Amino acid sequence: MSPQTETKASVGFKAGVKEYKLTYYTPEYETKDTDILAAFRVTPQPGVPPEEAGAAVAAESSTGTWTAVWTDGLTSLDRYKGRCYHIEPVPGEENQYIAYVAYPLDLFEEGSVTNMFTSIVGNVFGFKALRALRLEDLRVPPAYIKTFQGPPHGIQVERDKLNKYGRPLLGCTIKPKLGLSAKNYGRAVYECLRGGLDFTKDDENVNSQPFMRWRDRFCFCAEALFKAQAETGEIKGHYLNATAGTCEEMIKRAVFARELGVPIVMHDYLTGGFTANTSLAHYCRDNGLLLHIHRAMHAVIDRQKNHGMHFRVLAKGLRMSGGDHIHAGTVVGKLEGERDITLGFVDLLRDDFIEKDRSRGIYFTQDWVSLPGVIPVASGGIHVWHMPALTEIFGDDSVLQFGGGTLGHPWGNAPGAVANRVALEACVKARNEGRDLAAEGNEIIREASKWSPELAAACEVWKEIRFNFEAMDKLDKEKDL
């Protein structure tokens, strides 16, 4: 923004426009332990210096506006303003920079992810001086983390509730996602659960449509999982989607699920909103319900490399808002996810303390100060041949969710579930014996299929299926000349 002649007002106020960098670019600033730190990928318009672009981001996401205002004199800008304290060029990209911004903690309401994102990723993303802007990462200080409840229960409490240890959990999204009657839907749930799955799932699209109202679905699914529990002796769950058009209706559905005695409900946290999600998470903790989170709409926000917000930031926001599971990509399936980047935000979901590691896209060290962890869910285009890779990549604290990879079995839902359970148990056994899942995965599956006709049939159906597309979300590297 070009400087403009300042006009001196009669009370000593200097009106006019001045460059943002004069106030908001402070390379000498030493960050505080209580600051929220943000790493923005900034693409300035031609002719806009990177320092001015970074300062504009700091200003417009904190105390600044396009012109000086006389009310600036009524507060302490030095106390409340955001500061761009460091800028570095992005390797391999022309006119693209990482701008680091520090925000004083007093700018944010305690316990409100909604308020945090309203400030940091608000109007600044439409700022004309920038061609594009992407929030790559946040460092949320312990002082702010401690104002959040976080996940309703967390990983260890969920395992204790389910009495399941030492392996990933298995799930399945019921298909077709739309169009089934409630009774037929419940039948599909029962077949999958009795075949050996731990969970089945409402699709994110399923709320309360004319072909299947929510109350009918809840009742038939509860009947299905209780019947499967009685037959198998294992605790079962179905993610009943409580997402609704109002927060009041959402809570009403969660209350009904609790009255049915089911263990888990579900929410679409981005389309539903962080305020609704946090309210539901609080209800779930108070009433003993696990909370599964779907990330529908995330790719609208995080898919583009130079604009929007990286999923690792959305994942941090979810852990603060509250959820016991969240979909996190597969690395090997049909949906977006490069291995190093995916494992970076998987660790941010599960672990208590994560060191800065730019090789995995982690810009800041993050201390969660004992906030419960979130189980990542691998879902989308996966089948039995992927089981060794998924077990090796995600480890035990994960949910491996096979929708078409269960319901597409040539013999039906229950045999599809059997095939997945046998494949998983074979991979866990092989891993515990010291075998290399990455190198011997196909052999492990073939060996297991000799003793399971259901697995053998699944192996035959999906032996040629591949999703060989290059990931859009990749680490920054110098380009070859």
UniProtKB/Swiss-Prot annotation:
Chief localization class? plastid
What SUPFAM superfamilies does this protein map onto?
A: RuBisCo, C-terminal domain, RuBisCO, large subunit, small (N-terminal) domain
Q: How is it modified after translation?
A: The disulfide bond which can form in the large chain dimeric partners within the hexadecamer appears to be associated with oxidative stress and protein turnover.
The EC number(s) this enzyme carries = 4.1.1.39
Pfam families noted in UniProt: RuBisCO_large (PF00016), RuBisCO_large_N (PF02788)
Proregion residues excised on maturation: 1-2
Q: At which residues is N6,N6,N6-trimethyllysine found?
A: K14
> Which subcellular locations apply to this protein?
Plastid, Chloroplast
| Catalytic activity annotation | 2 (2R)-3-phosphoglycerate + 2 H(+) = D-ribulose 1,5-bisphosphate + CO2 + H2O; D-ribulose 1,5-bisphosphate + O2 = 2-phosphoglycolate + (2R)-3-phosphoglycerate + 2 H(+)
Post-translational modification N6-carboxylysine, affected residues: K201
Q: Describe how the cofactor binds.
A: Binds 1 Mg(2+) ion per subunit.
- Record PTM N-acetylproline, positions in chain: P3
The name of this protein is: Ribulose bisphosphate carboxylase large chain
